[in-house]
């Protein structure tokens, strides 16, 4: 689908955000370094993950509305 420039920026932001989110999730779930971090830092990273996931959902909804 061809998007207007301002819409394409949202699509690009969504794509980039999801790539960063996947890396963060992989780090949290699979990297032994994560387990060695202080509990407070682990909590902050998990909160960051949740915030990024929520942000991704908002962008997904905006993109869906482009074709509505």
Q: What does each model-found stretch correspond to?
A:
Residues 1-68:
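Extended, charge-rich alpha-helical interface modules
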């Amino acid at each position: 689908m061809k998007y207007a420039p301002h819409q394409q920026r949202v699509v690009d932001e969504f794509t980039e955000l999801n790539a960063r989110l996947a890396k963060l999730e992989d780090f949290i779930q699979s990297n032994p370094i994560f387990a060695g971090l202080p509990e407070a830092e682990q909590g902050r990273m998990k909160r960051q993950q949740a915030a990024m996931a929520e942000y991704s959902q908002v962008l997904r909804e905006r993109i869906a509305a482009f074709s509505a």
